[in-house]
Amino acid sequence: TQEKSTMQTNHKRNTQHLLVNPKQCIWGNVVTDNLLGVYSFFPTQSIDFTELAPFKKGLLNGGCGIVDDELHCIYVDDTYAAYGVLGVTHYAFNTDTWELIEQSLQPKSWNVIATETAIDPKTGEVFGEFYSANLKSLEWGVIDYRTLTRTTIAKAEHSYIALGITNDGRAFGVADDGNLYQIDRTTGVETLKGSTGINVKDEAENHFYQTGEIDPNTNEFYWAAKTANGNC
């Protein structure tokens, strides 16, 4: 059987440096001028996307996780953010049929918005970096997508754009400073492992949506990277 992991990706990309496990099937929220929805693909030099669920209502940009046979996602609509208004919607898809089975607005549930999430391949726990209830800080926590509640472990030191968990439970993430860190899932302590060599933020300190995932079979970290100038 093919192992599957989920990630959000923004573009058909050059993957000439991806040399690991070309049979690894990945699920992702693809957002391009021509493609919009949940797709599957393989990390090969020439990537073809297969549509699983058409989804044109927004981006799955606030975190996601698989619970049993359901893919749960958060969409954050920031159209009116300048006026202090954020739309938060919880979506769930059946991963056998890819039918949309849940769509619910979550007014004022800002603490379920994640910059990035990752699933423990052994326990199914969804660990991530989330906004605080007042949106003023970032914090590590564990979310239950069934009840839309989460814990708070500790304040986060960096803002993360890619996150994954190995098959022995270690969490790693790429922060928006372009560095790779290991995150202690109990204390939230972030330990620098090294630079990725990729410049993510532009001069205004902004960056594109992107994500990552760790293959639970090989512990290889896949990162759908997008540089500050928009290159994939």
Language-model features and meaning:
Residues 11-18, 57-69, 107-121, 157-168, ...:
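Repeated scaffold domains used in trafficking and secretory/extracellular systems
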Residues 48-57, 99-107, 151-156, 190-198:
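Beta-propeller fold detector
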Residues 33-40, 80-91, 134-142, 177-182, ...:
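Structural motif
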Residues 208-211, 222-226:
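Loop/turn-rich, solvent-exposed surfaces of beta-rich toroidal or solenoidal domains
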Residues 42-45, 93-97, 144-148, 184-187:
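Short loop/turn segments that connect beta-strands within beta-propeller blades
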Residues 78-141, 145:
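A generic tandem-repeat structural signature
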Residues 25-29, 71-75, 81, 125-128, ...:
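Conserved beta-propeller blade signature
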Residues 3-54, 64-66:
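An edge-strand/N-cap motif at the start of beta-rich repeat modules
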